[in-house]
Structure formats: structure tokens, C-alpha cells
């Protein structure tokens, strides 16, 4: 077997800047920035824009999407003018 084929797997801190939340895990991600963690050790830190602490799905602040169908929405806006309706049409 060939040696050194696997990427370096090491402890990394991921920091959610929006929520002010950070967690220590193991990853192959690298960074030049470091942070001192609660245990006194220094770890590389990777800043992320969104995590489970700030994502609307996990925080319960998700917007509800209108589930009305496109055909129903069209008919509501413009009315039903198909065959058999009172809207007229070709005679």
C-alpha cells in the first residue's frame, strides 16, 4: 500500500461569525488564523457564514413558503377562461 495518501485530519475550530458561536471538531480544513480554545490549546480557526446556530431551519425562524400551485395562482389572478366557463372564448 502507498503511504501518505490520506489528507491530514486534525482538530479545527469552526466559528459562526453571525451567531457568535464556535465549536471544536476534527476536519481536513486548514487555516492560517488560530484561536485559543477553552482547554488552553491553540487550534486553527475557520470562519463560516452560517451554521446550525444561525440557519433559519434550525433556529425556528424559518419563513413559510406559500404552497399555492402555479395554476391556481394564475386562475386567481386572471380567472378561468377555458372551455365551459362563462368567460367567453371562441364561438
Curated annotation (Swiss-Prot):
One GO MF term attached to the UniProt entry: structural constituent of ribosome
Determine the domain of life of the protein's source: Bacteria
State the UniProt keywords alphabetically: Ribonucleoprotein, Ribosomal protein
Q: Name one GO cellular component term.
A: ribonucleoprotein complex
**Biological process terms in GO annotation:** translation
UniProt cross-references to SUPFAM superfamilies, sorted A to Z: L28p-like (SSF143800)
Under the heading NCBIfam families, the entry gives: L31 (TIGR00105), PRK01678.1 (NF002462)
State the family named in the UniProt similarity comment for this chain. Answer: Belongs to the bacterial ribosomal protein bL31 family. Type B subfamily.
Q: How does it assemble?
A: Part of the 50S ribosomal subunit.
Name of the protein in its database record:
Large ribosomal subunit protein bL31B-1
What species is given as this protein's source? Answer: Streptomyces avermitilis (strain ATCC 31267 / DSM 46492 / JCM 5070 / NBRC 14893 / NCIMB 12804 / NRRL 8165 / MA-4680)
Q: List the top taxonomic levels of the source.
A: Bacteria, Bacillati, Actinomycetota, Actinomycetes, Kitasatosporales
Amino acid at each position: 500500500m502507498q503511504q501518505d495518501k490520506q489528507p491530514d485530519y486534525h482538530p479545527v475550530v469552526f466559528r459562526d461569525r453571525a451567531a457568535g458561536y464556535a465549536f471544536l471538531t476534527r476536519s481536513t480544513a486548514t487555516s492560517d488564523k488560530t484561536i485559543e480554545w477553552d482547554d488552553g490549546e491553540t487550534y486553527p480557526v475557520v470562519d463560516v457564514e452560517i451554521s446550525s446556530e444561525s440557519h433559519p431551519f434550525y433556529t425556528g425562524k424559518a419563513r413559510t413558503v406559500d404552497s399555492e400551485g402555479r395554476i391556481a395562482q394564475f386562475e386567481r389572478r386572471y380567472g378561468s377562461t377555458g372551455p365551459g366557463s362563462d368567460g367567453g372564448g371562441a364561438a
